[in-house]
A protein has these predicted regions:
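Aliphatic-rich helix starts adjacent to a transmembrane/signal segment
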Residues: 2-69
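Residue-level preference for alpha-helix termini and adjacent loops
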Residues: 9, 39, 45-48, 69, ...
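Short linear sequence signals and composition-biased patches located at protein termini or domain-edge surfaces
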Residues: 44, 48, 52-58, 62-67, ...
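C-terminal globular interaction/adhesion domains in large, modular proteins
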Residues: 80-143, 152-154
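Short loop/turn segments at connectors of secondary-structure elements within structured domains
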Residues: 145-147, 204
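Short polybasic amphipathic segments
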Residues: 147-155, 179
Length: 251
């Protein structure tokens, strides 16, 4: 009759080895989870940046390309529809801007709506009656630390409405023809608002070149990490917007 061997427990060394292996696996799991959270956060930040850039450029393009629009061209002309008023020192002028001041340039766009024609203002509203719309885009400080700004729009001199946050700079150039001896209306220069004012080119602006700069959502996440890639603090996006009333496209 065989003798039954007595049961033995784990020795202290075996327990310590098991605990060490468990801690190693747990550490790997926590590192994986932390990495996934960082990745998801970075992807979310990039998606938000793309949405902000797309929305900002769409709002700016919808308004700027409508500059100079007026209904019933058989009755009105640009000169009669948009007389001298405020910053518009020339009859028929539909664009005006400022440059050089922090945190960025500003642009003011004027056009008319006939009512129920689907023409929108910078806040996305349409109108049921004929209205003159003066839209001013600029950056406004949000009062945060560190200081951040938002793209805002003021309609007909009213209080500015915040459109997009996270914008750090707005640079605007205006496409004009400065060579008066050549034929046609081809753009030969992109000038700042100051240069356009000095040359008296506002009535002949055919396009607008926008550069919007946003805070880079990946900049903070890359600090303290060893990487061969330099992560910029900001990201800039550029777009050229044609003024349809000037380039022969019906609005």
């Amino acid at each position: 009759m065989s003798r039954r061997r007595p049961q033995r427990g784990f020795t202290l060394i075996e327990l310590m080895i098991a605990m060490l292996i468990g801690l190693f696996l747990l550490g790997g799991l926590l590192t994986l989870v932390a990495g996934m959270r960082t990745t998801f956060g970075m992807q979310g930040g990039l998606a938000q940046l793309q949405d902000s850039e797309r929305l900002a450029m769409t709002l700016l393009a919808d308004v700027i390309q409508t500059a100079g629009y007026y209904p019933t061209p058989t009755v009105n002309t640009a000169v009669t529809a948009m007389p001298v008023s405020g910053v518009y020192t020339t009859a028929g002028q539909s664009l005006y801007g400022t440059a050089g001041a922090a945190p960025g340039d500003s642009i003011t766009v004027r056009y008319l709506t006939a009512g129920n024609d689907g023409v929108i203002d910078c806040t996305g509203n349409t109108y049921t009656v004929a209205t003159t719309l003066v839209n001013t885009f600029q950056l406004t400080a949000l009062g945060t630390t560190p200081q951040t700004y938002a793209l805002t729009c003021s309609l007909n001199g009213a209080t500015a409405v915040q459109l997009i946050s996270g914008v750090t700079n707005l640079q605007i150039l205006y496409g004009v023809k400065t060579n008066t001896t050549s034929s046609g209306d081809s753009i030969d220069s992109y000038l700042t608002a100051t240069q356009v004012t000095a040359g008296g080119y506002w009535p002949s602006v055919n396009s607008v070149l926008l550069t919007l700069t946003f805070t880079n959502p990946l900049y903070g996440t890359a600090q303290g990490q060893t990487t061969s890639v330099n992560v910029p603090q900001t990201l800039s996006f550029t777009r050229v917007i044609g003024v349809m009333a000037k380039i022969g496209v019906a609005t």
